[in-house]
Each structure stands twice: as C-alpha cells, then as structure tokens.
Amino acid sequence: MAQSYVGQKRIRRYYGKIREVLEMPNLIEVQKSSYDLFLKSGEGPKAADGEGIQGVFQSVFPIKDFNETAVLEFVKYELEKPKYDVDECQQRDMTYAAPLKVTLRLIVFDVDETTGARSVKDIKEQDVYMGDMPLMTANGTFIVNGTERVIVSQMHRSPGVFFDHDKGKTHSSGKLLFACRIIPYRGSWLDFEFDAKDIVFARIDRRRKLPVTTLLYALGMDQEGIMDAYYDTVDFKYQKNRGWVTRFFPERVRGTRPTYDLVDAATGEVILKAGEKATPRMVKKWIDDAQITELLVPFDHIVGRYVARDIINEETGEIWVEAGDELTMEYDRDGEVKGGTLKLLLDQGITDIPVLDIDNVNVGPYIRNTMAADKNMGRDTALMDIYRVMRPGEPPTVEAAAALFDTLFFDSERYDLSAVGRVKMNMRLDLGKPDTQRTLDRDDIIACIKALTELRDGKGEIDDIDHLGNRRVRSVGELMENQYRVGLLRMERAIKERMSSVEIDTIMPQDLINAKPAAAAVREFFGSSQLSQFMDQTNPLSEVTHKRRLSALGPGGLTRERAGFEVRDVHPTHYGRMCPIETPEGQNIGLINSLATFARVNKYGFIETPYRKVIEGQVTDDVVYMSATEEMRHTVAQANATLDEEGRFVSDLISSRKAGEFMLNPPDAIDLIDVSPKQLVSVAASLIPFLENDDANRALMGSNMQRQAVPLLQSDAPFVGTGIEAVVARDSGAAIMARRAGVIDQVDATRIVVRATEMLEPGEPGVDIYRLRKFKRSNQSSCINQRPLVKVGDVVHRGEVVADGPCTDMGELALGRNVVVAFMPWNGYNYEDSILISERILRDDVYTSIHIEEYEVAARDTKLGPEEITRDIPNVGEEALRNLDEAGIVYIGAEVQPGDILVGKITPKGESPMTPEEKLLRAIFGEKASDVRDTSLRLPPGAYGTIVEVRVFNRHGVDKDERALQIEREEVERLARDRDDELAILERNIYSRLKTLIMGKVAVKGPKGIKAGSEINDELLSTLSRGQWWQLALGEEADAKEVEALHEQFEAQKRALDHRFEDKVEKVRRGDDLPPGVMKMVKVFVAVKRKLQPGDKMAGRHGNKGVISKVVPIEDMPFLADGTHVDLVLNPLGVPSRMNVGQILETHMGWAARGLGIQIDEALQDYRRSGDLTPVKEAMRLAYGDETYEGAFADRDDEDLVEMASRVTKGVPIATPVFDGAKEPDVNDALRRAGFDQSGQSIVFDGRTGEQFARPVTVGVKYMLKLHHLVDDKLHARSTGPYSLVTQQPLGGKAQFGGQRLGEMEVWALEAYGAAYTLQEMLTVKSDDVAGRTKMYESIVKGEDNFEAGVPESFNVLVKEVRGLGLNMELLDADEE
C-alpha cells in the first residue's frame, strides 16, 4: 500500500546524540487541564470536593436566613449545550459560553416557640439558571465578545509560613532582626518579629504590633503554660555550705573553659579545674561512662536565673514568686544580704527551686523578657488589646473581642490556608496535620514562635522567597474559581436579606436568587482582568508561548515598581521549570516568564520537571516528576553525561547538582539524571539551533522575535531546525490533524472530507469533515489561511497532518524563509545592522505577507430617525459609488484606496427652519437630500487592498436587504453541500455493510417480484433499488436482528444529520442579537499584500535584527562563481561584539544543506534521463548519513524514494537540538560532503563591475524572518489635519493623523544655524497661528507664494495663564502709545 502524502513528509537528519526517553507533553496542557478541572469538578462517579465550581458552591451553600427558619442547599450543577459554536461566536461578536444550571433545595422549618425544637415543614427543589460560563476552545483560548483571549497563569507567593530577616537594614547597629509570617490563601496575615531589644512582637494584618505573649494569652494560655511551651526546666537543690546540686550536661561544656571547678556532686571530686579546656575526648568519656549525672555549683551560680513555676505558700495561698521571675539577692553597703527573691525562698525553707534552662548561649530569654514587658496578665485584657488594634475607636467588650479573635484565624469562612498552605506549614514546622484542616490552631502558632526563637538562637535557616518551592502557579481554573466565589458571596448577602423579608412558605428557590452578581463577576474577570489578555496571534508560536506564560503581575501579585532585583533574577530552582532565557526586555524583565518545555504544574500549583531515575550508577527509563522542594534532597546529573551501552556512567566523576549547588560526584552518589538537554529552556528558545553558541542576551532577543514573525504567502520550513518544529505546529492547532484514520474522499480549498476507517465510539458517523479557515483575520491582523496537503484516495492515520495553517509547512513550524546570505560590507548600506536585499525577493514574493483589516459600521436608531445603509448618498458622484452594489455595500473583490466608500450610510440631520417658499418647493419636488448627511464608512488614509469578505447583521424583525439575503443563501448552500456529502458517504458505508451481511443468505420474503427462498446475490440486488434492500427478510433470526440494528443505526444517524442541518440553517436565517439601538451592522474585511520594502524589520533566530536599507537589482548583487546571486547582504561587524556565533554555524550548515539538495536534484535528473536509481540512492545516503538512510529510506519502494528525494532538492533539512546538536566537526563534515571548502567561505564577485572581491566571503543559507514591525504601519504623511483644542497645535501620532514634533532641541538647532525665517514659519503658520495658517492654505490653493505670520495660539494660552496669576497683560500695537 502506498504511503500517504503526509506519511512521507520531509525527514530531517538528526544530529542529537542523546536518546529521548520522554515525549514532550502537550504544550497547552497547562490551560486545558486547569479549566477542565474547574468545569467538570461535579461530573464523574464522585464529585471532587472542594475543587472547581463544585467546591465554590459547597463553600458558599448552604445559606441560612438570620433566624434559621429556612435553609437553601446546593444539590448539583450542570452545564448545558452552548447556543453558538466557536466560529459563530467569532462572527457575531459573542462570548462562547454555556448556560449553567444549578439544582437548589429550599428547606423550611417549623420552630416550636416554647422548646425551640425545629421540624422540617417543607422541601422544594428547583433548577435555577446561574448565568453563562465561558467555555475553552480546543486550543486553550476563550472567545469573549468575538475576540480570542488567553488567561495567563499567575505566579504568586505560596500560602504557608515563611521565616526571614531584615538583612540588618532596620537598626543602625546592623543587627539581624528575624521575622516570621503566616500567609493564608485568604484571610488575615499574622506576623511575628523581633525588635532591636530582642523582644518578640506579633502583628495582625500589618497593623500596630503587640507583644507576642498577648496573642498567647488570648489563645487561653497562662504564664506557666507559656514558659513550659518554650523552655526546659532544671531543678536546683540547695545543700548547706556546699552550694547547689544540678543536672550535668556534658555536651554544653565541650570546647569551653568553665569559670569554676566542675565538681561531681556524688563523690565531691573535681573533674575539671576552672580555666581548663574541656576537650571533645573528655566529653565523650563523660557521656559514655554516664556516671556523673549531677554537679555541685557555687551558691551565686543560681542568682539571675528565672523561676520556672509559681511558688506558693501552701497554707495561705500567697504567691512568693511567679513563673518567669528573676532570682535575686540584694546586698547592703557592708555586703550583708538584706533581701531579694532568693533570700525570701531560702528563709521560707524552700531549697528545691525549678529554674528555666536559659543559658543565653544556646537558649535566649526572649519569650520570658517579652512576658516581663507585657502589661497584660490574662486572657480578657489580651483580647481587649487585640480588639483595640483591629478596630480602633470602637469601645471593646469581652464578648465582641473574643468573637473577633475567633473569626480572624479559626473560622473556616473567613480564613483559609488551602491544602497547599497546610502542606507547606507541616513541612516547615514538622507538624503532621491533615491537609483538610485549613484554619490555624494553637499548636501552629506556638510552633511558629518556637521556630522563630530558634532562628534567633542560630538554629535553622531562613527561607528563600524566590525558591520555586515557595512560589506557586495559579492557572485559569483557580483564578476563575476565586472570581466566581467572589460573585457568589455577593449573591449570598442578597439571598439572606430576601429570605428574611419574604413569606418563605410560598416561595421557590428561583425567587430567592438573582444571578446577576455571579455573572457580572465572571464577565468582569474575562473582560477586564489584568491576566485576561488579548491573544497574541501573530503566528502559531506566539499563540503557544502566550498560553504558557507565567506572570508575577496581576491582582494579588507584584507591581512593576515594587519588584526588586531578586524577584526578577534567575534562581537555581528555575532549572527545567521556568526558562532562564525567554522574558521580555524592558520594565517587565523577569516578572513575565515562560514555562520550560517538559515542565508541568502539579495539583498544589508547584511546577514540576521530569528526571530519569539512577539506581547504583545505572540510568533507568523510569521517569519521575519532581517539584523544587523534593528535588533539593537529590543529586541530579545532566542529560549530556556520557553513558555506555548499558546506560552506566563512563567517567569516575560526574558534574551534578544538589540543593542548587554544582559539584562533581562519583556515579553511585547520583539519584537522578535530566530527561533531555532541552528541558531547561522554553519552546521558543528550543527552536533556536546552535543555541549553545549564542550569548544569553541575544538568545533572549531571538526567542522574543520569533514570536513577532509574520505569516508569509509561502512558508518554508528551516533547513537547519531543532526537531521540535513539528511538535509546535501540532500543539498550536495551526495545522489540522486527522481525528481518526480514514481515506480522503473529497478535497477542495475549503474543506476535506474523510471516510473514516476506524471507529472511536460506536454509533459515530463514519465521516469526518474538516472545514479549512480561508483568509481569516487574526488578532494582530495577520492572515490565517489553511491549505490541504492531501489528495483524493490518500490514506491518513490518526494524528497525521491533513492541512497546513499559517506559518506551517508540511506540518512543521515555518516562521520565515531560507535565503542565501553573504556577510560583507556593501557601500555602507549595511551600516548599523541594516540589511541589503535583492530585487529577486520582491519579484518572487519571498517575503510577501497578507494582512487583513476589519472595518465595521452600524446603522442606529437616532432621536431624529433611523440611519440608513443605502447607495443613495447626497452630493456624491457616481465615480465614488462604483464599488457599491444596490444595497450600498462594497462587493467582494473590489480594489479600494484611501477615502473610498465601503458602506454608504446616511444619518438624519436636525431640521433647520425653512422659509415658506422652500417648503413649497420641497412639497412639489420631494427633495430629500437636504435633511440627511453622509456618514458613510470610508477607507482610512494609508490603507489599500482588496475586499475579501463582507458580513451583514440584521436585528430581529428588520427586513433584510438584497446583500444580506445573498450571503444567507450562500451559507445555506454550503451547509446543504456538507450535509449531502456526509449523507452520501454514510449511505455508501452502511449499504456496503448491509451487502456483506445479506450476500449469500436466503430471503424468506421481499418486495414485489422476489420469490420467497431465493438466494441473495449481485444479480438479484441489481434489480432492486437500494432502499428496497431493507425489505428483504432473512430466514435466520440472528441475521435479521443484525440487519434491523443496522437499519436503526442508519436512521438515527440520518435524523441526527438532518437535525443538525436544520439547527444551523435556523441560526443563519434568524436575526442577530445586536447591541441596543443598532438596527443593522456591516463588517468589511480588506486584505492587502505587503511586499518587503526599505524600513521593514527583519531578524534571524539568534537575536540578529536589522532594518532593510535598500533594494538592489539582481544583476548588481554580489554573485558566486557558479552564477548564484546572493539574496541578502549582512554586516559582518554585527557578529563579534554580540557573541551570537550560532548564526554563523547556522549559515554554514544551511549552505551544506543546500549543496546536498542540489546534488540530489542532479541525481534525480540523471535518473529521469537514464532510469537508473543508484545515483539517487547514493546522493540520499551521502546527504543523510548511513544511520538515518538505513532507518528511513532503505526499505522504501522506488516510487516512494523518488517522491521523498524530490522533496529535498532545495535543501536537505537537518535537526540540531539545543545543547545536543551538531558540533564544529559535524559542520566541517557537512560542508565537505556538499563539496564546499571547509572554511565555509567562497570567492564572490561584484555584480556591478564583475570583478572579484579581494577576500573570500562567508556565504551560506540562513533562516530569516520578517517581523511584525512594518514601515507601512508606522510611517504616514500629513498635510493638514486635526488640531489640539487648547493649544491649537497639530496632534501627534499616526492614529490621530498627527504631525511631526518640532521640540525644544530642534528649535535650538535651527537657532544655531540662524535660520530665522524657517524657524518663524515652523513656530507659527505650520503650527498654531490659526489665522495665518488659514491664509497660507488659501494662498497655496490660489498659487500665490506670500504669507504673513501672526500671533501663535500658544502665546495667547501663556497670556491667559499669567492672567490666572492675577497679572493683567495686554498687547499693544506698535503704533499705539
């Protein structure tokens, strides 16, 4: 069987050495999976609790009224079918959305007045419409008001607990002040911080600070409890005349020199003299022997310590000392003890004192000092304090204070840590709480403060906020969920009020609900949120990149002004997650990033990247995805580490990284290895061949400029690619893929009809119709056009490309063209990166692109009467109407120029009072022209082109004009043709199945003229019409049943087809929903061909950009010895300082590819002459190398081989993947095989003189793009035009048809030259001298050449301003005194 056309698509010679273990995931998976989870959360066997829409409804419902006599519960929700499909929404400027239907249950209770018991009185269920929910298209976008938009994912700080310090900036001493912050997903922030005096404070929502013990009291703790939570207790026992006996901690004396003898309390021997060093060996011995447990310490050793518990007089209940009090001894002048807490206790006979284990080295007294500084002593006063901080100026009561404190952190409606926050908190503080507990509790707060004091004591590390384990991604689904929750909460208030105000018994759920707030929240999010962006649709790559973008801006994110260097910088954890290269230049640098190629977002919103497992130095094919936090524990080798056949490491030391540090490790220390070398860059960066030879700054420009490449008339896949071009084309949705295997039945430019040969679902019709998009306008006015690649009879497999879209060539991304370039100066025309181009580029339309502009006009109903779209326009000659049809609308195919009328429209004018004579004349002649004015839609200045499409929209009940009816007829015909084709294939399919079923069987009875019992064969069937075949009854019951089932399936599919057709036709014929006051709307699409011209911007893929300076005739361009003319001449000085050497390697490689293609072409010509295929095979083997040739071509039949060879005659495509591509020897080898000098340079001749240039020149083939910065869109010329209202100076900018600014510095320049008259003219008559410029215009029209300058308007403005200051300034004429 012959391969299909696309099955033999171009094969690239692959230079990568590393085997790909993992397919690249779908590039727009981020968008799709996130929104699917949001919309479908309620479907499936078990509804996912707390996820998506389901979760939002569960969190807001049930809603109770204020006295709890009724409750409104949520049962389930479902999305109905959308009213219009994607294309219809785009045409009609509507939002592609599905109605959301929610089932609610209202339960009404009877409350017993006396006992207060509640009993159910009534239950009602009802479906309620809750607004429209926008749906995502197959390509991951949304259609909002007819335009395609993308919701960009947002990077924000993950909820959880963070520890940090001020880097010594707050206090002049440079002391580090530590702080800790608990960030919830929603709710109040809680901060703990040290001040310069080492006292710990708490802040709620960044308000005034409170001592942290106040918060602990408010949590219901007392002084002893607080001391217990933060400090260990050590007992001191007093022995008269010997001192105190206390526990011995050998660890604490290691490496120190004690100030007193260490005496063993049990034996009384000195184990270490004062001033001697305790060596680690001694300490180890003490620990191992474990004989010395207690020490005897001098009496004054306890002074200054703090008591651990309240010590009370048991009999009277008097408190002698409280927990946290200092033990003191007070002396008089003679040194006699006269008081102090320690003396008090000893006098009372208390010799056993529990003391806090604070040594000021390992454990500091911060919490104890805070407690001493805190004036609160109990819960009530602490709560009041917190209330005063949160609600200043309101009189506090204990109940109100307690209620406020409870709602702040412990009420799940007001406070939500989210699953992520709980997981992060558990990890940081070693808690083991379930991730369903989403509020704080006492343990969390105690643990946070403990971790903070330990940081101050030098234990542990602070967190890095730029670590990707501490930043997470909020994708579409989650952003939408938050927005919808806001809408529902607004609705909840209204429902509660309504429940208490109406008679609840007689009411239905429908009457309680007003869905406007929820619908408005959704509409606002899609319409005006900072993260809902107009899709960048310049080319397929820009679409994909836009959907994979991660922004740190937006609601709840950073702002450009506040973001510092650290946030924008590349972090080690970006590896394999976010691209270090692709980010915008300018103020957003580093705030907007791109997802790396293999990265994905996990259920908690952290970015994960895949690694292969390594077990004992053996690399396996097991792939694991890891988030940044998990990766910290592993040692990861790079993808380019050399492995042997078995997958073991070759070298003894392997370059690897662990916890963000690079190091060399032996093979057995390595756990993971990268999946692929391109996993660390984004899609755009991985499209740059030889990226490893480019400087990062230029690679950044290269990846950004590929997104601005305009789709050209003819696409051309790059000779030198990276091998992922096909993936991008596939996932972007630009090219059309076959949904299932089949045979091509019909093909024309607008659709492909496929007879399916595989059934994905039973009962599915066996026909696929692919509608191609022809000359549609993209968001950036570039042209979207699809071309079929297949021919009738081709076999296609599932997932194969059947049609190319914009910027795709045989299913591969093709943003530019391969052109022959030379690096040499040429008469200064390539100064400062300018580009010199050959006229061949214009002649052959190499860089010609089509741009489509849309113009629309609406006829409204005004106060003075309706506007009218008509051909009958007052005061307009027949010449101006030449392109309009009888309805006043331009016809398709008309060539239009600036000022041409596209749609004729007249608007009623206000009646001016008329004289009786006028009235009489009007009555006689019926003159209508004077009361309407011409408001036709005209083509704006600077626009030329051809009309490619016209759409007319009418309001319901408004009569359609001829043009609208004609468009409607064409549309219905098209739908009918689709239906008929589908039906024909369906019938063919079903009848062939029926025939195989009944052939050779016996008919029991049949239509007229068929004998019972006759055998069914071809002859018998040919006498019957197809419809009569069903009437043949078979003897076998099983057979009869099968025929019956087939008949039912046929009828059902026919019915479905008719129903679909009817539905579409009805939509076409029905009027349109237009905005209020609009009766009729016409849209006109104008296409213009833009050839390349001086001033247009071009770029390569390596950040090498330039502007075209001149178009040179072909014969004047430099040429090679074989007569090949160069297409572009570039400046060689653009390479060294910019360090993007990749472009030179690409040029050489492209030159070799072209040379090999020419060799294959010559071999094919030989074959056509001689019929011998050997030279073709040899040329192919030479071009592709033995390995690729054996794998891809060796077993093809001759016809296929010739077909495939003829496809690479222009150049043999190669793939050199990033970081794993062709090296210098490979480039040299390719040039050698192509028969070129290995220097890559050629002798070049000057086209003007025919003389040889003095030195060889680097000539090669380079992939160049034409960018979306076209001179036609930037340059315009103004003679006269609009003026600013106050200053009367011309406006600025092309959009306002403004003038050229002559600023302060330009005035200085003219002054310096003494060009007085030029200057006067510039500042008066050419700008804001109103009378003067009018006179000058008149004199030019009359052909005179004199003018007079008057007073500029700006001078009058100055005079008025001075008068505003209270100084009356008057101008006197020269002759007045």
UniProtKB/Swiss-Prot annotation:
Pfam families linked: RNA_pol_Rpb2_1 (PF04563), RNA_pol_Rpb2_2 (PF04561), RNA_pol_Rpb2_3 (PF04565), RNA_pol_Rpb2_45 (PF10385), RNA_pol_Rpb2_6 (PF00562), RNA_pol_Rpb2_7 (PF04560)
GO biological process: DNA-templated transcription
Matching InterPro entries: DNA-dir_RNA_pol_bsu_ext_1_sf, DNA-dir_RNA_pol_bsu_external_1, DNA-dir_RNA_pol_su2, DNA-dir_RNAP_su2_dom, DNA-dir_RNAP_su2_hyb_sf, RNA_pol_bsu_bac, RNA_pol_bsu_CS, RNA_pol_bsu_protrusion
Record field: catalytic activity: RNA(n) + a ribonucleoside 5'-triphosphate = RNA(n+1) + diphosphate
Top-level taxon of origin: Bacteria
GO molecular function: DNA binding; DNA-directed RNA polymerase activity; ribonucleoside binding
GO cellular component: a single term: DNA-directed RNA polymerase complex
Keyword terms, alphabetized: DNA-directed RNA polymerase, Nucleotidyltransferase, Transcription, Transferase
EC main group: transferase
SUPFAM superfamilies in the record: beta and beta-prime subunits of DNA dependent RNA-polymerase
Family: Belongs to the RNA polymerase beta chain family.
Function summary: DNA-dependent RNA polymerase catalyzes the transcription of DNA into RNA using the four ribonucleoside triphosphates as substrates.
Quaternary state and interactors: The RNAP catalytic core consists of 2 alpha, 1 beta, 1 beta' and 1 omega subunit. When a sigma factor is associated with the core the holoenzyme is formed, which can initiate transcription.
Name of the protein in question: DNA-directed RNA polymerase subunit beta
Name of the coding gene: rpoB
